[in-house]
């Protein structure tokens, strides 16, 4: 039996959640129905548009452009600052509601998730079941979502993007040719601006042209990423839904940069800082991780995430840095970066960890070193001992 996978994506999440909060507080205007945007910090980011209403979109306002340009297009546009605590609570409310329908949920980001409802349809058709979920979110939480339906995560995610807002879209294998292949190749999941440019140089303009291209040439030019996007263009995705649980299943850390970065050395130092924090939190929880993922958001607000499953569980900061750095170097296409994050998942306790006998001495030394550093930092502060790569930054 084929799986039934939903991708639930909040429509203009930040703006919608701000609108819901304002209406709850007694304000008369629904900012979703007038030209409005959620804007960033004007001092440090020059006021970029983080989210926009549908009426604002009609003025040509796009996510990622400056508030200055947005105001030139629509002088009377309403601008509201982001409220991340509000967004976190709204996201949690949605996840709690969705758990009533199935326990098989993977939270992909703050405003989207995957659901494996294969065994939860209760005799209903998938579109009917999705409609119930969509309407429950609208009626109980006050905002709208798109639901994409297919047999795997990739096609469900692509389906949710086909027609917005407040829509249910399907994208099954037999629909790929008509619904997905005509789309520009840049709209395919995991094809960023840099990859799009390189594919265009090969005269690949649409997803369909990518699907029909010689995969061996793509692998020769782009290695594993070339094979992956070719598979995605053909609707191939064998990944499973990681079940959402109330207990800690992952530890993550991310930072929004004060300016867009392309400098490899500076980015590496930020990555090291994130991993230092994660390593200590992992050890504080007496956990090891079996999977590491790196997330980036580019200057044009495109999100990318690559994950690596590890042969052996790790908890040392050194290992986390080495894996995260390798993953980042494999995925980054040199686009300017505005957000960088690292996530540790597949957590397990020390009693279930198997260490390779070849690495046992090194792992033991790293474990002792990390625990010693953790103890010193807790007592005297995070900056009392720093890795040389970070110390060089302070000395310059």
UniProtKB/Swiss-Prot annotation:
GO molecular function ontology, one term from the record: damaged DNA binding
Annotated GO biological process: DNA-templated DNA replication; error-prone translesion synthesis; SOS response
Binding-site positions, Mg(2+): 9, 111
Any one annotated GO CC term: cytosol
Keywords recorded for this protein, A-Z: Cytoplasm, DNA damage, DNA repair, DNA replication, DNA-binding, DNA-directed DNA polymerase, Magnesium, Metal-binding, Mutator protein, Nucleotidyltransferase, Transferase
Catalytic activity: DNA(n) + a 2'-deoxyribonucleoside 5'-triphosphate = DNA(n+1) + diphosphate
Compartments it resides in: Cytoplasm
Cofactor names: Mg(2+)
Annotated PANTHER family: DNA REPAIR POLYMERASE UMUC / TRANSFERASE FAMILY MEMBER (PTHR11076), DNA REPAIR PROTEIN HOMOLOG YOBH (PTHR11076:SF35)
Function (record text): Poorly processive, error-prone DNA polymerase involved in untargeted mutagenesis. Copies undamaged DNA at stalled replication forks, which arise in vivo from mismatched or misaligned primer ends. These misaligned primers can be extended by PolIV. Exhibits no 3'-5' exonuclease (proofreading) activity. May be involved in translesional synthesis, in conjunction with the beta clamp from PolIII.
Protein name stated in the entry: DNA polymerase IV
């Amino acid at each position: 039996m084929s799986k039934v996978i939903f991708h639930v994506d909040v429509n203009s999440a930040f703006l919608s959640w701000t609108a819901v909060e304002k209406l709850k507080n007694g304000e008369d205007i629904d900012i979703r129905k007038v030209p409005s945007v959620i804007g960033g910090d004007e001092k440090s980011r020059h006021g970029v548009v983080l989210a926009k209403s549908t009426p604002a979109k009609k003025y040509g306002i796009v996510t990622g452009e400056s508030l200055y340009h947005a105001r030139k297009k629509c002088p009377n546009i309403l601008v509201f600052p982001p409220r991340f605590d509000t967004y976190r609570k709204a996201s949690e409310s949605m996840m709690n509601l969705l758990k009533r329908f199935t326990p098989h949920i993977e939270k992909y980001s703050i405003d989207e998730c995957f659901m494996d409802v294969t065994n939860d349809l209760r005799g209903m058709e998938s579109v009917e079941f999705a409609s119930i979920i969509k309407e429950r979110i609208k009626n109980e939480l006050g905002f709208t979502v798109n639901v994409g339906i297919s047999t795997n995560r990739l096609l469900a995610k692509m389906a949710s993007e086909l027609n917005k807002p407040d829509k249910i879209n399907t994208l099954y294998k037999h629909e790929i040719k008509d619904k997905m292949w005509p789309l520009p190749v840049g709209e395919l999941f995991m094809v960023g601006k840099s990859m799009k440019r390189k594919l265009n140089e090969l005269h690949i303009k649409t997803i369909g042209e990518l699907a029909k291209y010689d995969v061996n040439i793509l692998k020769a030019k782009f290695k594993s990423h070339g094979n992956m996007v070719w598979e995605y263009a053909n609707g191939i995705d064998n990944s499973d839904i990681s079940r959402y649980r109330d207990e800690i299943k992952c530890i993550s850390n991310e930072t929004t940069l004060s300016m867009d970065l392309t400098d490899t050395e500076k980015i590496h130092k930020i990555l090291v800082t994130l991993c230092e924090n994660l390593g200590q939190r992992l050890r504080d929880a007496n956990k090891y991780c079996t999977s590491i993922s790196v997330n980036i958001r580019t200057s044009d607000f495109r999100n990318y995430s690559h994950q690596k499953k590890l042969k052996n569980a790790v908890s040392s900061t050194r290992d986390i840095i080495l894996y995260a750095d390798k993953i980042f170097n494999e995925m980054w296409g040199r686009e300017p970066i505005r957000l960088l994050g690292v996530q540790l998942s597949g957590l397990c306790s020390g009693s279930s960890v198997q260490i390779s006998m070849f690495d046992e001495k090194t792992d033991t030394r790293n474990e002792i070193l990390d625990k010693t550093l953790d103890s010193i930092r807790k007592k005297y502060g995070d900056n009392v001992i720093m890795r040389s790569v970070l110390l060089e930054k302070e000395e310059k």
